[in-house]
Design a protein with these regions (language model features):
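Sec-dependent signal peptide recognition
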Residues: 3-9
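Generic cytosolic/nucleocytoplasmic N-terminal low-complexity/intrinsically disordered segments
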Residues: 2-3, 477, 482-483, 527
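C-terminal motif of bacterial Sec signal peptides marking the signal peptidase cleavage site
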Residues: 15-18
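Extracellular beta-strand solenoid repeats
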Residues: 419-421, 427, 438, 444, ...
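Feature marking well-ordered beta-strand scaffolds used for ligand recognition
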Residues: 20-416, 431-437, 451, 476, ...
Length: 542
């Protein structure tokens, strides 16, 4: 159901005093109209599984359409695309994502001079079935970044103050009430305006809200409670901020990184001579005793926090080939347990291992769209991918309890074309990407395994899985076939983008009480085959 809320600014509302008369707080609304949508039948078609499934990684030694390394060995990082969430309309592009609890909060803007934006809330509590629960569309304002905190979304962006009676300046922040995944009380929105062409980043810190607002803008500090102005500091060209403990890092495109203390005094400066591009957001991230900086065409700069020394440049890998040099820019960085993710615009999403002070480029993830922003939490990566919207990626790392059970098994390091001969009995652990599996003997796999092509358990063979098995893609379906007299035992998750065929005399057995079968194709079971055990049939195919 659509609700159109007329936006009438209350002129006598909460005028904040400050060192700048540009910084003003308004209780009520911003532009001519805001449109909300909470109807699941309208929202859910935004979620697409059309290209869900196994994601390849184009590796450093052989970038290209086949996605293979030179030796065709099994790859690490068995990633899978869970789903895509398309933008609310064809003009909008995903700009930022924040993940908190069971929900992801996604912002959208327009890349040209037109002002338009949106925010969506996505329920990710069921990793197999994400759902858009609520949406708010700003018809005359960009939303460039956001953060959820304690029942509110704090969103920042830009509006054309020349044509909006409600906006004393282009750069704004909105505090929007959220209840159980819904935007349900837009009359309670509070707005603040600060100097700068457009606000580009926001961070909740203790009981304050920090906002950066680009060229000729500021670092503005608001009260979290009611957006009362606390302080404002002018900077030439702020692009983003990052906070760890009481350390605050600012990226100023005119100079480099400034590290502030809790009183917003500069305690350290890192000079960076990089062309960050005009009016484009670039993020930075604390990591151990270093700071990672998105440096546009240069990739990611790694700097020492203690003395500001440049320690490393992590380059931009390109796949597919032929991407325009102007589209090869690092826009954002994120880290997760020793893995650096770089949002490289048209050059895609790249992965680099960063441990013990060294870096090793893994490759480029097989994704569509220009990657504007990346966030990672738990076992997931969330990529804001321009016109492709939000892409939800599962890392499929084995659970700690599973790792313990698999600890006595050797890690698999062989070919990505996995074959077991008649009479052979093999058992491996790992988190690997494979081309295919042909099993004619006895095979135990423990861990997480993604398979680009088919899995065939030949006549009278045995295959046991303890962990996660993902096969195929929804736009390139592949089958699992359990042939005559064969047995397939599963303790964990089987995610199949294709058909499951259980032939005469074959057995499919689910062990334990929490196994999952998520089959996107058909399940074909011979009348003399056996399926037993307790499991969750996600798509009702059995």
């Amino acid at each position: 159901m659509l609700k159109k809320i007329p936006l009438v600014v209350v002129a006598v509302s909460l005028l904040a005093t400050s060192c700048s008369d540009q910084t003003t707080i308004y209780q009520d609304n911003l532009t001519d109209t805001v449109v909300t949508e909470n109807d699941a039948t309208v929202l859910q078609p935004s979620v697409s599984f059309s290209v869900a499934g196994v994601l390849d990684i184009y590796e450093d030694d052989a970038p290209g359409a086949n996605g293979k390394g030179a030796a065709d060995t099994a790859g690490n990082y068995p990633l899978s695309l869970v789903a895509q969430v398309s933008p609310p309309n064809s003009l909008l592009t995903a700009s930022h994502v924040d993940v908190e609890g069971d929900f992801a909060y996604v912002s959208y803007n327009v890349v040209n001079e037109t002002f338009s934006g949106a925010i969506e809330i996505i329920n990710i509590s069921n990793p197999h079935d994400p759902r858009v629960t609520s949406r708010v569309v700003y018809r005359n304002a960009d939303i460039n970044a956001l953060q959820y905190h304690n029942g509110h979304v704090y969103a920042v962006g830009g509006v054309d103050a020349m044509i909006s009676d409600a906006a004393p300046s282009n750069s704004f922040i909105a505090k929007i009430p959220v209840n159980a995944g819904d935007f349900s009380n837009l009359s309670g929105i509070i707005y603040g305006f600060q100097q700068g062409f457009t606000a580009n980043d926001v961070f909740i810190h203790n009981d304050e809200v920090l906002v950066t607002s680009g060229k000729d803008g500021s670092l503005t500090v608001y009260s979290q409670n009611d957006l009362t102005l606390q302080d404002e500091f002018m900077y030439a060209d702020l692009r983003s901020l990052s906070i760890r403990g009481e350390e605050i890092a600012l990226l100023d495109a005119s100079q480099g990184v400034k590290v502030l203390d809790k009183k917003y005094k500069t305690v350290r400066e890192i000079n960076i001579n990089t062309d960050f591009g005009p009016s484009t957001k670039k993020t930075l991230k604390f990591h151990d005793d270093r700071i990672m900086v998105s440096e546009a065409a240069k990739g990611t700069g790694v700097y020492s926090l203690s003395d500001g020394a440049l320690l490393d440049y992590i380059p931009i890998m390109v796949d597919p080939e032929g991407v325009s040099p102007g589209d090869q820019v690092t826009n954002a960085v994120a880290t997760n347990d020793g893995l650096l993710m770089m949002a490289n615009g048209g050059a895609g999403l790249s992965l680099t291992e960063i441990e013990n002070g060294s870096s090793k480029v893994v490759g480029v993830v097989e994704l569509r769209g220009s990657i504007n922003y990346v966030a990672s939490k738990g076992d997931y990566i969330f990529a804001a991918s321009g016109s492709e919207g939000l892409q939800i990626i599962k890392m499929n790392r084995p659970a700690e309890t599973l790792v313990d059970r698999c600890s006595d098994l050797p890690e698999y390091t062989g070919s990505d074309k996995f074959s077991v001969n008649v009479g052979e009995s093999v058992a491996y652990s790992g988190a690997k990407r494979l081309n295919h599996i042909v099993n004619k003997g006895a095979l135990l796999l423990c861990g997480s395994w993604s398979i680009r092509n088919a899995v065939s358990i030949e006549a009278d063979a045995l295959m046991e899985l303890n962990g996660v098995l993902i096969v195929g893609r929804n736009n390139g379906r592949k089958d699992i076939t359990v042939k005559k007299g064969a047995t397939f035992k599963i303790e964990g998750d089987m995610i199949l983008y294709g058909n499951l065929k259980v032939e005469e005399g074959a057995t499919l057995e689910f062990l334990g009480d929490s196994s999952v079968a998520n089959v996107f194709g058909d399940v074909v079971i011979h009348e003399n085959a056996t399926v037993k055990g307790n499991f969750e049939d996600v798509r009702g195919k059995f």
